Amino acid sequence: MGMTSDSIANLLTRIRNALMAEHLYIDIEHSKMLEAIVRILKQHGFVAHFLVKEENRKRLMRVFLRYGEDRRPVIHALKRVSKPSRRVYVSAAKIPYVFGNMGIAVLSTPQGVLEGSVARAKNVGGELLCLVW
């Protein structure tokens, strides 16, 4: 079981490395889970946009990264919380507020992949996938 068996950790690492190298986008193997996470990142202004494309019978997701006026990444940190080796579940009441509410928590819930404040409002908990700020 290498690193790549954790596709979410792989996504976060690929984004982190691409931002440090000032790349415009990353291409990553598509999955519904990863698309749901990236869609939340886009809604909260952490990535510019994304698209899903077929290439050599493989579905790829291209994620366009976002930089501020000063060419600095708008993302300061991406932290994987729950891991295949150690799952982390939280109730709605225990969903963390991230970085003075400037960041987000992403959860996998019975109602789908949700951002923390949305899950809190719906009063659903779930697996705490990652934190972004």
Curated annotation (Swiss-Prot):
Highest rank taxon of the organism: Bacteria
Record bears the keyword RNA-binding: yes
InterPro entries per the UniProt record, alphabetical: Ribosomal_uS8 (IPR000630), Ribosomal_uS8_CS (IPR047863), Ribosomal_uS8_sf (IPR035987)
Gene Ontology terms, MF aspect: rRNA binding; structural constituent of ribosome
Gene Ontology CC, one term: ribonucleoprotein complex
Quaternary structure (record): Part of the 30S ribosomal subunit. Contacts proteins S5 and S12.
UniProt function note: One of the primary rRNA binding proteins, it binds directly to 16S rRNA central domain where it helps coordinate assembly of the platform of the 30S subunit.
Entry's family note: Belongs to the universal ribosomal protein uS8 family.
Full protein name: Small ribosomal subunit protein uS8
PROSITE patterns given in the database record: RIBOSOMAL_S8
Gene: rpsH
